[in-house]
């Protein structure tokens, strides 16, 4: 709908330019937003206020000319001027109702991509191997997964790339420790965190051990068979730990999506050679660097992008450049999204620029760093254990499930006291599992991607507010309507007719699902979908309270309200699925 309004405004601008009301050459960014109060229309634009000065007119006078010039359209009932010159657009209720009927009949809820389908590479999760995943890996994993799901829903071909850290100093450290502990090492490997900490302690405390670790890295990189065999074993165990976390989280990542740093080893020397051939490299204290004038330090000197150390080793930038070239040459990506901590913003700005100057990627290939903030504890600092250690992600998820189970068990006892049929233990465990995992994921996804946030079990497990339990309950409330009806959602007759204010408000929200999904895909911001679903659930609650469904006054009204309820249920479920959340029929 917003795109339609933008097109209508553009047609009006073209007409006013042709008749001399507006000067030629104006290319305004036409903004169309939802109104805060639907009594003032469904959508609003400030285009008249934007162009009043170049037009030499008062905003309201220009707004009046625009209203006259905007073509009639079946989706619009009227356009009004408000305040200092806003244009308020009112949807046609008959058209709106018909569009919702079409959405209900469509398995995709009427959602289509605004633009051609693309091949999109999603770089997500990407933990360093040789130790277990910790809470710091949560955001990249679930935000990337949600955006990947949205893009697939819109028809893009999505290629997930888990760019794991499977190469480097940490493996030399582990190999050296394995030499010292040959008897117990295999057993200790099953608790990678314990094994890694022990090796890191030796590395930090013993210069001899550190030197041996570096020697083993060189042997590993040279292809030593024994080192490669042990390195492979470390990776297998580490990746199996990762897969358990992914399965627990319900994210769409598998071993087939792993494309670690080591996959690009054979191309790193060629990357350096190609940068040299392009004349982009400068030697600085023995290291090979690219200096970009756009990125300077506090003294005004260009910052280096180091691609090869003085000792011959390669860095993250070298691997990232090789990966970009692979993603263009082999994966044929139109767009690459990097879900990496926003503290790496400068790194990505630099390597993106180097890749383009070197010709590793074409100008039309989109490279986007989807940075995110930090998950903090209640004290506002990075989330840690009580003794200051990192929190294993699997431990966090287990605690979430345990807390959720205790919560739903208590509610189940209250259910029995009210004389309602209680859930059995198997059902309670499943409900607790879904509520626990969904709550952790939703609490994160509902925050703006670039914002830091404080992790709080009590808030995220609440059945009030913008939480997973609240939305899960909204889904079960819709499902209960059709259980009482004794009929499936797919068997409904009649058509939607919008009469009451609550029906209109719910319908207007449902109609915006497609625009919303496209916006999430464009910006990589799942919190917009969370906010939409939360508002939708609230509007359904108001509709449910004020507009009797099963006891409606006449059959046509009953059919209409059942259809609105059915579309609401499907939209909630589809939205939660796109976020990577499970839903429940009852809870």
UniProtKB/Swiss-Prot annotation:
Q: Where is this motif: 'HIGH' region?
A: 127-137
Q: Which SMART domains match?
A: Arg_tRNA_synt_N, DALR_1
The protein's location, in the record's own words, is: Cytoplasm
Name the Enzyme Commission number(s) assigned to this protein: 6.1.1.19
Query: Record's InterPro entries?
Result: aa-tRNA-synth_I_CS, Arg-tRNA-ligase, Arg-tRNA-synth_N, Arg-tRNA-synth_N_sf, ArgRS_core, DALR_anticod-bd, Rossmann-like_a/b/a_fold, tRNAsynth_Ia_anticodon-bd
Q: How does it assemble?
A: Monomer.
**What family does the entry list?**
Belongs to the class-I aminoacyl-tRNA synthetase family.
Question: Any idea what this protein is called?
Answer: Arginine--tRNA ligase
Gene that codes for this? Answer: argS
């Amino acid at each position: 709908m917003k795109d339609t309004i933008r097109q209508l405004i553009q047609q009006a601008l073209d007409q006013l330019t042709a008749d001399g009301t507006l000067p030629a050459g104006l290319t305004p960014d036409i903004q169309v937003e939802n109104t805060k109060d639907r009594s003032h229309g469904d959508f609003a634009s400030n285009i008249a206020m934007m162009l009043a000065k170049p037009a030499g007119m008062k905003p309201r006078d220009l707004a009046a000319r625009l209203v006259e010039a905007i073509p009639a359209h079946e989706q619009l009932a009227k356009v009004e001027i408000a305040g200092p010159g806003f244009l308020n657009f009112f949807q046609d209720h008959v058209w709106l109702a018909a569009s919702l009927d079409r959405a209900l009949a469509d398995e995709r809820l009427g959602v289509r991509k605004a633009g051609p389908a693309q091949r999109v590479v999603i770089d997500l999760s990407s933990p360093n191997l040789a130790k277990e995943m910790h809470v710091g890996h949560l955001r990249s994993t679930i935000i990337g997964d949600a955006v990947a799901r949205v893009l697939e829903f819109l028809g893009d071909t999505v290629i997930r790339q888990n760019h794991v850290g499977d190469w480097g100093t940490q493996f030399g450290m582990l190999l050296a420790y394995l030499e010292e502990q040959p008897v117990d090492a295999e057993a200790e490997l099953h608790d990678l965190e314990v094994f890694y900490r022990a090796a890191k302690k030796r590395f930090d405390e013993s210069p001899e051990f550190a030197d041996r670790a570096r020697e083993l890295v060189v042997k590993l990189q040279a292809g030593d068979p024994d080192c490669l065999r042990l390195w492979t074993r470390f990776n297998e165990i580490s990746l199996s730990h990762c897969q358990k976390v992914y399965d627990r989280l319900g994210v769409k990542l598998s071993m087939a999506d792993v494309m670690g740093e080591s996959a690009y080893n054979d191309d790193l020397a060629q990357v350096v050679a190609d940068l040299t051939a392009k004349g982009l490299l400068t030697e600085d204290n023995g290291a090979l660097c690219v200096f970009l004038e756009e990125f300077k330090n506090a003294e005004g000197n260009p910052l280096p992008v180091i691609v090869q150390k003085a000792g011959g080793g390669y860095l993250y930038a070298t691997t990232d450049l090789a990966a970009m070239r692979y993603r263009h040459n082999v994966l044929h990506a139109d767009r690459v999204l990097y879900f990496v901590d926003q503290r790496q913003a400068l790194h990505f700005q630099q390597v993106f620029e180097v890749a383009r100057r070197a010709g590793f990627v074409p100008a039309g290939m989109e490279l986007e760093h989807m940075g995110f903030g930090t998950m903090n504890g209640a004290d506002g600092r990075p989330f840690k254990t009580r003794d200051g250690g990192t929190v294993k992600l699997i431990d966090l998820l287990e605690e979430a499930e345990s807390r959720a189970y205790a919560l739903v068990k208590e509610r189940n006892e209250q259910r029995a006291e009210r004389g309602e049929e209680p859930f059995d233990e198997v059902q309670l465990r499943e409900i607790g599992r879904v509520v626990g995992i969904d709550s952790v994921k939703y609490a994160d996804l509902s925050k703006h991607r670039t914002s830091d946030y404080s992790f709080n079990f009590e808030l995220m497990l609440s059945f009030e507010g913008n939480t997973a339990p609240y939305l899960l309950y909204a889904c079960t409330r819709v499902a209960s309507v059709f259980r009482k009806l004794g009929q499936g959602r797919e068997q409904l007759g009649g058509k939607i007719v919008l009469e009451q204010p609550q029906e209109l408000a719910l319908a207007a929200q449902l109609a915006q699902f497609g625009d919303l999904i496209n916006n999430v895909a464009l910006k990589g911001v799942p919190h917009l979908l969370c906010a939409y679903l939360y508002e939708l659930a609230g509007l359904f609650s108001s509709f449910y309270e004020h507009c009797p469904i099963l006891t409606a006054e006449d059959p046509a009204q009953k059919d209409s309200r059942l259809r609105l309820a059915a579309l609401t249920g499907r939209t909630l479920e589809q939205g939660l699925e796109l976020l990577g959340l499970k839903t429940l029929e009852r809870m």
